[in-house]
């Protein structure tokens, strides 16, 4: 196998970067560069957007796939996000939407008939194929092809391909890992075969004799005989192969590998990978580009690769097979998921649109017992709810095919938008003498890291009442009376009012919090179950397809010979991943909203004291205190106030106990939420609470620096000597401003909350009945928008209106000068 990681990545991508630097000399004269730069949008994760294109169309949630009809008369998009799912019919020539039909469930698969009179679409966990007739430029439902009974029966169709001459529709699935053959005339399943792995894309060879199936879970492309369905060959690829593209001559298939920054070219005669293209912006970059869609120009000389997590298209010259070279990059919207070329235009679907935003109407776990307080934020007093999972509507961009100069300008913009560089990977931002080193392996006076993960709160929900920070008191559900310890940590150590989680919900949140990355499987699947459309919660190590390529923080610690131990996180009574086996506390209760966090804290104290006694405290300690998730209004379970207060007291007692231990002077505690989905925030739906405590942490300090989940992880990595896990933590700003050179080892004193921790929900009301429908045994195995509303009303009153979420499409960039204030 010929690997072009060094040639195509190092020579190609670096050559592009150097060309962009040369162009910088004339940038002031470049009207396109100046115009696009002036519209730059900075996302909550620190990355930026300057999407190319003269026109765009608004779509629904998370467009996953885009297909063109045989003549190019139509384009179809399937929108498969958390809220509204639909099929959109588009005229790619006039660049207008012809029709948009809502679907109960849909997922990825689309196929036009040869005569363009019929469109087939995968019906998600309804386990059927939706059939539409196209007449007068409209989609008209024309029945279904049923594969089996709906969820909880596990089938879930994904990629489709059609052999019109044989009246056969081939369907890959991702829940029962199979390939189905359907008769399009009788609308019946006529054959099926087990694949053994979750499928993604399904394509027929040009002569219709063979099928190519990308085994999303199996790190391979399977070739099957189209008549017998017998396996002809399995061709090994990198992790998470997704989209595929066949050349017209039938000699090669390109496959994007979403969990590996790469696209592989398969020689179908040799049945092996003969070239690997690295799609990332720098040589040997860690995981984080997420290539997930492919397109060729009509003459097949240029290949476009949609890099979902780099927010760009990578462009390769592929005229000479085995001698491909990088030409540059094109900036897109947020999380591009599909790309096609038509009529000298590049069509791109942007899964999360063009920006993030605030959600003052966000979910509220604690709807008040008294009339809603009307504060300064007028949006907080309107009726609609803004749930983060459905806030980011997709878009489609139409980008005229760029010439060489325009592509150079686009490439420079992509590099400008991307905070990750190879230099940052090895030399982080910081200051000389600070306890946070700037290089991996440099010494730090801090020896022990304690990392606490909690559940789902925004900044305004908890600290909106703190006058020193940028808060909105009208959105504060859990003020100091309920969360005295978190308020004390913010006041005594560092108040962080510009901290953003990288995730939308717990499914991707636990991946971002444990690996600074959520791969394409996670990002494209959590929306289904969170939208109440079936699916399972398996995003905390349960399925290897959801694992980042290089594993989680414990895997990286193991490679770096850093000792570690986890308490209830990725270890619910047993190890969820191999790296945690033998490194978890069996007496620490896993996720269970019926078990108090203060009891978990006692179990940690007992285990910790024994480790201290034996001089065996690991350097990295991860803990889960998750009761601030709350149980909503379910009768017999703690009220939202009591659950959050329990969580707060556990945190306070933890810091107090550690601060009175012999290792406090060498310790630091980092605390964050896995996501911020369960509440409103007037700045952005991703803004959340975060805390840092320890001897080397500043006292009485307000830090307005923009930080992220990945930045907190980067800070821990620099202390412990662990290399970045992804491009995101490599790029993120470390939290060095929170630290001081001279330690202050004054211990912390926990505060008792101003409410009864044993207070239970007692009202058999409408919200109780709604809560009974929820599965609270796992994080967010529920409709979180509704759950957030229940929490809001339980706290603020059953008739109060929960503010909508603000999602940060975020801030239009000014060159930022970070502020830090001493109190």
Where are these regions (language model features)?
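Bacterial N-terminal signal peptides
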Residues: 8-15
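Long, compositionally biased, charged low-complexity segments
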Residues: 17-19, 817
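Positively charged n-region of N-terminal signal peptides that target proteins for export
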Residues: 1-5
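Predominantly soluble domains enriched in secretory-pathway, periplasmic, or organellar proteins
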Residues: 8, 20-434
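A general, composition-driven signal for non-globular sequence regions
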Residues: 15-16, 111, 618, 708
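N-terminal pro-sequences and low-complexity stem/linker regions of secreted or lumenal proteins
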Residues: 408-823
